Amino acid sequence: MFPNSILGRPPFTPTHQQHNNFFALSPTLYSHQQLIDAQFNFQNVDLSRAVSLQPLTYGTVSPIQTSTSPLFRGRKRISDEKAFRLDGKRQRFHSPHQEPTIINQLVPLSGDRRYSMPPLFHTHYVPEIVRCVPPLREIPLLEPREITLPEAKDKLSQQILELFETCQQQASDLKKKELCRAQLQREIQLLFPQSRLFLVGSSLNGFGARSSDGDLCLVVKEEPCFFQVNQKTEARHILTLVHKHFCTRLSGYIERPQLIRAKVPIVKFRDKVSCVEFDLNVNNTVGIRNTFLLRTYAYLENRVRPLVLVIKKWASHHEINDASRGTLSSYSLVLMVLHYLQTLPEPILPSLQKIYPESFSTSVQLHLVHHAPCNVPPYLSKNESSLGDLLLGFLKYYATEFDWNTQMISVREAKAIPRPDDMEWRNKYICVEEPFDGTNTARAVHEKQKFDMIKDQFLKSWQRLKNKRDLNSVLPLRAATLKR
């Protein structure tokens, strides 16, 4: 991607290097994304209605690779795959409203490892400690189990499934983003040697579409000695340097770089090779944590991903899915869907943070958060509602049942809870709790006109869909497919 900038010929002169002691510490965070080989082999969904998550492999490498070997000239490192015997035990998983439901939790036995959840990243780590961070070693990854999509027994459910299968992010889309991330990490490490660049958001959380942008988090201070970067001063300074080099040194590969001085400043840019738009922030590490929390929810129940993707498409079509214009962010929309599925009389989703607090605690170090999806078995709900019924129920819930004035959406608690009386919440029209840091993810909705527009769209869409039971009545499928 950047052929003249990595292998023996850095694009930045020594005068442009950072010599501040603040960034001169040797890196200790061994990112799960170091030179990931994005080996995805998605199955044909037309025949089997199944999506297979493919193995990725990673290992320890030096922050800046200067080898001239062909191995580091953009070619993939391929691990031998081994076949493992499937073995498991049965375990009880309690539904809050009914008798315990029996599910199969596949537990590793006799050295064999296989999970019923599709692990995106999975590795053993060497027990020896290097500055408090266990280094990773490259190993073969297991073939993940196929995730079958739900059956569609009515027209509306069939439309939802077909739109999902057409618009969901493909293996090639993720591979493009990962290759760009890996190359940019090497470039940025020439400025900040201890930094790591993480791909976060919808690209990894299971809710991405083919048209989804890429979100990147640059971590320049690492755990266990991690502390927050001041977003108004340090983050802006770091991003100013990154933006400058994007403009001057990488202009042949990156176009339209913009430094956005928001509450959480970002650099927006477009990669000319992959044609993907990216947003890059600094040390917004909660985004790394919630990426893997949402990924676990995405694959916990097979109706979640199709429902979320169609609702995001619906919101975008009606122009209520743009935080920069005072409406809902995609993240807030996803949390709203998860919350609805948690609050049904027979829930389709539980609260993962309550059931697995050790896996989704903020005390879990960043280099370990990717283990969480591997440790959670599927949740088998007794709720047999179709995708069409769930979409209708979602619209009805927020149109007629949820109390916007007094309640806050909480996925962490798996219920609507009273709004806090703090200033941060008092004057906001919509309150959606961020599961890790407790902030309001819907704070962008600060105008009554936009709030009324959002509520009105929920009500009108619910009424139309209830009468016609045709997705085209609220989301023209042809237009949605073209914007996939």
UniProtKB/Swiss-Prot annotation:
Binding site for Mg(2+): 213, 215
InterPro entries linked: MTPAP-like_central, NT_sf, PAP_assoc
Enzyme Commission number: 2.7.7.19
Cofactor (UniProt): Mg(2+); Mn(2+)
UniProt main location, coarse: cytoplasm
Superkingdom of this protein's organism: Eukaryota
Motif range (Nuclear localization signal): 76-92
Cellular localisation: Cytoplasm; Nucleus
GO cellular component: cytoplasm; glutamatergic synapse; nucleus; perforant pathway to dendrate granule cell synapse; postsynapse
Sequence positions bearing Phosphoserine: 62, 69, 95
One annotated GO biological process: histone mRNA catabolic process
Keywords: ATP-binding, Cytoplasm, Magnesium, Manganese, Metal-binding, mRNA processing, Nucleotide-binding, Nucleus, Phosphoprotein, Transferase
CDD domains documented for this protein: NT_PAP_TUTase
Reactions listed under catalytic activity: RNA(n) + ATP = RNA(n)-3'-adenine ribonucleotide + diphosphate
GO MF terms held by the record: ATP binding; metal ion binding; poly(A) RNA polymerase activity
Residue ranges occupied by any PAP-associated domain in the UniProt entry: 386-440
Alphabetized Pfam families for the sequence: MTPAP-like_central, PAP_assoc
Protein function: Cytoplasmic poly(A) RNA polymerase that adds successive AMP monomers to the 3'-end of specific RNAs, forming a poly(A) tail. In contrast to the canonical nuclear poly(A) RNA polymerase, it only adds poly(A) to selected cytoplasmic mRNAs. Does not play a role in replication-dependent histone mRNA degradation. Adds a single nucleotide to the 3' end of specific miRNAs, monoadenylation stabilizes and prolongs the activity of some but not all miRNAs.
Family listed: Belongs to the DNA polymerase type-B-like family. GLD2 subfamily.
Oligomer and partners: Interacts with CPEB1, CPEB2, CPSF1 and PABPC1. Interacts with QKI isoform QKI7; promoting recruitment to miRNA miR-122 and miR-122 stabilization.
Protein's recorded name: Poly(A) RNA polymerase GLD2
Source organism of this protein record: Rattus norvegicus (Rat)
Gene: Tent2
